Design a protein with these regions (language model features):
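DNA replication initiation on ssDNA origins
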Residues: 1-59
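Short glycine/proline-enriched loop/turn "hinge" motifs that connect secondary-structure elements
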Residues: 68-77
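Short, charged/polar, Gly/Pro-enriched secondary-structure boundary elements
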Residues: 141-147
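Active-site-flanking beta-strand signature of metal-NTP-handling nucleotidyl enzymes
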Residues: 77-87
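Conserved small/polar residues in nucleotide/adenosyl-binding loops
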Residues: 154-160
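A short, contiguous, amphipathic alpha-helix enriched in charged residues
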Residues: 55, 91-119
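Conserved N-terminal glycine/acidic-rich loop preference
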Residues: 131-138
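A short beta-turn/loop motif at secondary-structure boundaries
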Residues: 124-131
Length: 160
């Protein structure tokens, strides 16, 4: 799925029409960090070293988060949404809903360890829609870049 992730939807700061607010208390928040803080954690030191090497002011990066946000080729984060089955076989009111929930919890809890260059900052399990599913939002990055900052945002090379 391609598109913008909705952090406000994931954290239930607003409710879409397919959400049952009476079940929202069953949702699980695994991780909720400010994306700007994550960018500072990941990129500030590399940005400082990069800027120190620049002889032209127009090559300096003032705010890496804003640079990525204003890029036509990048977006500040990526999101995956995972569910097991569909509303008929693992839906909220089926026998397998709890099994699906436990599998998704295990998957979400281990995602960061399995994907060390996808920095998870926002992750939620939703039990208030038709089927249990988990949203995982992350910032993909690489280290050791030779072309720009030593630590930089990239979706394609983060999976190598």
């Amino acid at each position: 799925m391609v598109g913008k992730g909705s952090l406000n939807h994931n954290s239930r700061e607003f409710y879409a029409s397919n959400v049952d607010p009476n079940r929202s208390h069953l949702n699980i928040e695994f991780c909720r960090e400010d994306i700007r803080n994550v960018y500072h954690e990941l990129f500030d030191k590399a940005q400082e070293r990069f800027n120190a090497k620049q002889t032209r002011n127009d090559r300096r990066v003032e705010d890496y988060y804003e640079k990525i946000c204003s890029s036509k080729q990048e977006k500040p984060f990526h999101e995956i949404v995972l569910q097991i089955g569909n509303k008929d076989d693992t839906g909220i009111h089926t026998e397998l809903a709890e099994t699906a929930k436990q599998c998704l919890i295990e998957y979400a809890n281990g995602f960061q360890a399995r994907n060390p260059t996808l920095r998870v900052f926002w992750s939620h399990l939703h039990m208030d829609e038709a089927t249990p599913h988990v949203h995982i939002d992350f910032v993909p990055y690489i280290t050791g870049s030779k072309r720009s900052m030593a630590v930089s945002y990239t979706h394609l090379r983060a999976h190598e």
